[in-house]
Amino acid sequence: MNQVMRRSACCLLSSLLLWSCVGCTKAAHESFGDGSVQSDSENDEAAKQAYKAFTVDALDRVAVDDLNSSGKLVLVNKLGAKSVHGDDAISFTKTVDDSNMYYVISMCKQKEQAPYSFVLYKDGQPHTLTTREACTSNGIETISLPAKNFPDATSLSIINIGNTDLVVSVYEVKKHHHE
């Protein structure tokens, strides 16, 4: 099967798998009622500046600020980060505790609309976090997934069909427990 057919099949499969994960993604400026997914960017200006810089460091500053100000999630470890054009993967530096969550923050730029996916891998076994039809306009997005839903993931693959630039950071976070 040629590469175009494989990518098309992979994109279709990712789209189908997305329905098993409905509700685990959100845009940075979208409200979400159940609180299971990370909070919005508290500082819109910081998010705009990060998008303008379009670097891992700028994205990480927004992620840390959001986590520190959310009161809902606490940063445990940074698992990895990368600036990506095309398909790529981020290998995790640590194993995530099953009681914690994977937390992916990203920003995206495209010259024309094209789909992309984030897929967790463990021993060659995939778990699609999200498939997007295109980038959101000038936004930062977050996705979280309880680690118990896909324990011991070793990497996050970025399946990027088209002319898409992404900056992606992956963290381990846990729910904040008020005493």
Question: For each predicted feature, which ranges?
Answer:
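Short, surface-exposed beta-strand/strand-loop-strand elements in extracellular ectodomains
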Residues: 112-129, 170-171
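Bacterial N-terminal signal peptides that target proteins for export
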Residues: 2-12
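Transition segment at domain starts
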Residues: 32-94, 177
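Short edge beta-strand/loop segments characteristic of extracellular beta-sandwich folds
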Residues: 93, 103-109
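Noncatalytic modules at the cell exterior or secretory-pathway interfaces
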Residues: 100-104, 146-165, 170-172
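C-terminal motif of bacterial Sec signal peptides marking the signal peptidase cleavage site
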Residues: 19-23
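An anionic, turn-rich surface loop/hairpin at beta-sheet edges
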Residues: 121-149
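Extended, low-complexity, turn-rich repeat/linker tracts enriched in Gly/Pro/Ser/Thr and Asp/Glu
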Residues: 107-116, 162-166
